[in-house]
């Protein structure tokens, strides 16, 4: 039962863990090479070490919870209603190339719903966090999503790739690619961008940022407008569908530029 779960204690623990994991990763930043996995994505020794550290710390505290990470898959009790999603380094290509836009993402879902999340960006010295019913924050300041009834030429739209089959690039906005799905979503939650469109993601990428977006009242949907907040019954190893995330107002505007066929 969630009433037996100490949210404040868990949030503090995850903030501490991600900060400590950030120091591990920073010690290897610019010193490790990436190797291509079977799915075509990169992995470094830093990814593995950071995930092992976070996984152990969480399971030491919550041995009856389930943990699912990008590198080592599932651990703990698979039937638990509590699911921790770990991305040890979101933005591995950036990390391996010496680009400082990468983060450590830890999200907790309860019965498939976003519950608690922390995204720590070590090089930027920036931390986002959110918990169920308590709002979303960046470095202690509460954040809010952009709400507007028009898209302006200088508004930032964060995309995962310059080639998104379901997106009409005639939309008059400024397109940017951060190289980190989690960070792009966090920037939307913080109001720095009007939205994000991502056509290639996995549950571990979005674990923390889904909580951020839920807490600021944003929508996260597929191209048909179906909510993606509920992870229950998902295949955690399968890539997610093309995602559109924004405030309800901006989401409606962005959906006008989505191609569903």
Question: Language-model segments: what does each one mean?
Answer:
Residues 25, 47, 58, 92, ...:
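Residue-level signal for inorganic ion chemistry
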Residues 48, 71, 88-91, 122, ...:
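Generic detector of well-ordered alpha-helical packing
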Residues 145-261:
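An extended, acidic
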Residues 1-89, 256-259:
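N-terminal subdomain of lithium-sensitive/metallo-dependent phosphomonoesterases centered on the IMPase/IPPase/PAP
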Residues 78-139:
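DPxDG-like acidic metal-binding loop motif
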Residues 69-71, 140, 179:
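Short loop/edge segments at beta-strand edges and connector loops
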């Amino acid at each position: 039962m969630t009433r037996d779960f100490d949210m404040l204690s868990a949030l503090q623990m995850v903030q501490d863990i991600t900060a400590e994991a950030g120091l591990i990763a920073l010690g290897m930043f610019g010193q490790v090479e990436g190797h291509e996995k079977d799915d075509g994505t990169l992995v470094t020794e830093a990814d593995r070490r950071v995930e092992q550290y976070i996984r152990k710390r969480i399971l030491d505290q919550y041995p009856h919870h389930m943990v699912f990470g990008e590198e080592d898959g599932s651990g703990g009790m698979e039937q638990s209603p509590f699911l921790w999603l770990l991305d040890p380094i979101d933005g591995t290509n950036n990390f391996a190339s010496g680009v400082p836009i990468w983060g450590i993402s830890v999200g907790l879902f309860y019965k498939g719903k976003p519950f608690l999340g922390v995204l720590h960006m070590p090089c930027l010295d920036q931390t986002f966090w959110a918990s169920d019913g308590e709002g979303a924050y960046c470095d202690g300041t509460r954040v809010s999503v952009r709400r507007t009834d028009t898209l302006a030429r200088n508004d930032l739209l964060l995309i995962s790739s310059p080639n998104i089959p379901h997106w009409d690039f005639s939309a008059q906005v400024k397109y940017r690619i951060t190289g980190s799905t989690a960070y792009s979503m966090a920037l939307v939650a913080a109001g720095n961008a009007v939205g994000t469109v991502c056509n290639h993601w996995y549950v571990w990428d979005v674990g923390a940022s889904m909580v951020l977006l839920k807490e600021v009242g944003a929508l996260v949907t597929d191209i048909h407008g179906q909510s993606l907040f509920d992870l229950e019954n998902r295949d955690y190893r399968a890539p997610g569908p093309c995602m559109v995330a924004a405030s309800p107002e901006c989401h409606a505007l962005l959906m006008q530029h989505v191609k569903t066929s």
